[in-house]
Amino acid sequence: MSWWWAGAIGAAKKKIDEDEAPRNYESVALIVGVTGIVGNSLAEILPLSDTPGGPWKVYGVARRPRPSWNEDHPITYISCDVLDSVDVEAKLSPLTDVTHIFYATWTKRSTEKENCEANGKMLKNVLNAMIPNCPNLKHICLQTGRKHYLGAFEDLKSKCHDPPLTEDLPRLDSQNYYYTQEDILFEEVQKKEGLTWSVHRPGTIFGFSPYSMMNLVGTLCVYAAICKHEGAVLRFPGCKGAWDGYSDCSDADLIAEHQIWAAVDPYAKNEAFNVSNGDVFKWKHFWKVLAEQFGVECGEYEEGQQVKLQDLMKDKGPVWDKIVRENGLSTTKLEDVGNWWFSDIVLGNECWLDTMNKSKEHGFLGFRNSKNSFISWIDKVKAFKIVP
């Protein structure tokens, strides 16, 4: 069994030095959201010599200029605002050799109604530019998430399904931009005969991207670095259910492998799949791991006084600037690398677990050891000098 299905942490990194160019490309990928937490993993894994469906030529799309931490990936980087239909048409419609689309981006608005409008428009812009112009387009992967079962952030879990969460559960009776995206996908693929799709629903993602709006590991690293700098205890900013209860997560590399599997395996076509690591953990154990990684005193759950990172970190911008200067870190602003709102949601609620049975029944046997995953992504945040 190759590393591809073995769930090996860091296997992709070990392969990079072995690959040789040039190659004749079998498949051509378009990653939309290439600087995001999963897009970055796709950009690392797709070009490898033994990636199924390959050799792959890869285009990567993101709104901002290419960051230094993404530059080593052997892809063609395209700066494009997918919310702007004119920009999309000009920059993406010429990519007529694309065979597979990996859509892994989103934008955050103040209400779910606005989320539906903006995120629906983004996906539709991309598909309108690609489907009519790519004669060999075979498959579209759409990444959504577990809020499919739990509801939008503004009414999270108010009317959610009882876990374990399975792919055949009906949609909730509420607005959800994931539903909007799915409906657009289902409608657009009908316009090209033989074009297939897959939907991927991860839980909380462990991965690396300083540009991600939902980067839990990076955010916790920044919090721990500030505690280290100030000699403070690493207080747990969450609820008892998160501290004592079972949680799970989705490794970004695993999600990338899951999407590539669905893109090339006939048995995975036209299906929606959960994607998580396949094990469970408790935050009270991972909190000790985080404290050890940064050499800080580990706090405990504080009965009756749940703290929030948004409150603890609201005045820490100057502190972070000092940490960056003193340690020669990559230049970042606290508001960019600290997704406090998202961390407060994850740690402020008990975890609603899913099941990977459907993926396994369809042939995907990938998994991750979540503790090893957590540590490996912490190491990557340090390696790219985001934290000391």
Swiss-Prot record:
Its EC number is 1.3.1.122. It holds the Pfam family PRISE. It is an enzyme of class 1 (oxidoreductase). NADP(+) binds at residues 35-37, 63-64, 81-82, 105-106, 143, 178, 205, 212-214. Coiled coil: none annotated. Keywords: NAD, NADP, Oxidoreductase. GO terms for molecular function: oxidoreductase activity, acting on the CH-CH group of donors. CDD domains: 5beta-POR_like_SDR_a. It comes from the Eukaryota. It catalyses: (S)-8-oxocitronellyl enol + NADP(+) = (6E)-8-oxogeranial + NADPH + H(+); (S)-8-oxocitronellyl enol + NAD(+) = (6E)-8-oxogeranial + NADH + H(+). The active site is at 147, 178. Belongs to the short-chain dehydrogenases/reductases (SDR) family. This is (S)-8-oxocitronellyl enol synthase ISY1. It comes from Nepeta cataria. The lineage of its organism: Eukaryota, Viridiplantae, Streptophyta, Embryophyta, Tracheophyta.
